[in-house]
Amino acid sequence: MPDPALRLPAYVDLRLLGRCNLSCPFCFGPRHEVPSMDEKDAFRVVELLRRAEVRGVVISGGEPTLLPYLTDLVAELSEPLPSGAPGPRVVLSTNGLAPVVTMKRILPHLSWIAVPVESADLEQHQRMRTGVAPHRDRVLGLLKEVRTRHGHVRVKLGTVVTRLNATGAHSVLDLVQKDAWLPHVWKIYQMSETNYGADNRDWLAVSDDVFEDVVERCAKTAADRGVQLQVYRNSTRSGSYLFVDPDCQVVVIDEGRERRIGDLFEDQEKIAADLHGAVDLTRNAGNFSGTYPDL
């Protein structure tokens, strides 16, 4: 049974760091200068999440593969619980730039991996995923590696729609040459206007009508290739998430905005009180299970 003192939703996003080896103008994650969660705190968080018997954890950042302790952390997190029940399903959200040798150490402990490709048009993709020129090829190579050699790991491909890629997003799956390499889920994201996304919304954000038009075209592509399509809309963001940030602050989404509600270790009573109404348990579960279904 879960520890009754830890009244957390079933699905948690663990943002371990802000640091990244890309500088994407639409990023909604922590600012790059935010200090990374140290190893001791990261393992304390994992211990707490396991005691709470959360059912799924998305590990993100920043770029989590930059952390030297990541392999040990996901191994610990994914272990069966002391009761004998399965550990939480672990999702790694990564930009895909880590060397294959690094990924081979991490992949055995994952249920899902989430990677991004923004456009079939290379120039559009490079304007969105800035910092490393061959990024798209690296992601497609990782996709092939996972689908051919790590069959237990499911793959979600993500595409964020902005003014930069509105004409090329719908053709992303055309870059995947063989059906056997296709992702299990392709998720289309409306740009979240948080952090860097908020800084750059005036020149990046598209209207709801433009976004829905892109979604319609993506749906046709996904149906043609037999890939499950999921869609994130900003209107559904509130109540769907509980984030743990690098400083161990718990973050919820109220009216589309991030709100910090306390330290995970020091403010548990306050967090429990604030979570009531701030996280919709049905929406939280539906968001995770829709994006990362139990296939």
Language-model features, listed with the residues they occupy:
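Structural preference for beta-strand elements that scaffold enzyme active sites
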Residues: 11-13, 56-58, 89-91, 112-114, ...
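Distinct, well-ordered alpha-helical segments
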Residues: 71-74, 100-107, 166-176
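Conserved alpha-helical substructure of the radical SAM core
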Residues: 1-92, 100-102
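Generic structural signal for hydrophobic
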Residues: 49, 77, 105-106, 146, ...
